[in-house]
């Protein structure tokens, strides 16, 4: 008789992946990265365990947005004072904080609970082409816009 194996945090083997985001569409990249962070690409996926891998994203400042989102997409934050709602377009956000749109899109695709916060800590986003994680020997992952 076969039994389903339940994964726990001691049995998880995490890999490191590096993705070059130059020229990729933001939403498509975010959904694929969220799936890897969650561990849904593994046959041993368990919903309540952090069984995903670590992901490094490079060139986040050279990401593409489809349609008219560069001018039309707005990012909001509030200063906690009356009338303090601030908004910024995606174009301005890519200039001021180039990693924010990528992190924001991926965080929105993760669970909204403690596990989601833990999974988000496995994501490392950099605006340039360099990263300080060479010691982990990350595997280069090629993603396409399809």
Curated annotation (Swiss-Prot):
Claim: Ribonucleoprotein is one of the keywords in the record: yes
Subunit description: Part of the 50S ribosomal subunit.
Gene Ontology CC terms, in alphabetical order: cytosolic large ribosomal subunit
Gene Ontology terms, MF aspect: mRNA binding; structural constituent of ribosome
Organism: Spiroplasma citri
Key words, A-Z: Ribonucleoprotein, Ribosomal protein
CDD domains for the chain: Ribosomal_L13 (cd00392)
Spans traversing the lipid bilayer: none
Keyword NADP in annotation: no
Family named by the database record: Belongs to the universal ribosomal protein uL13 family.
Pfam families: Ribosomal_L13
Name this polypeptide is given: Large ribosomal subunit protein uL13
Protein's job: This protein is one of the early assembly proteins of the 50S ribosomal subunit, although it is not seen to bind rRNA by itself. It is important during the early stages of 50S assembly.
Domain of life: Bacteria
GO terms for biological process, alphabetical: negative regulation of translation; translation
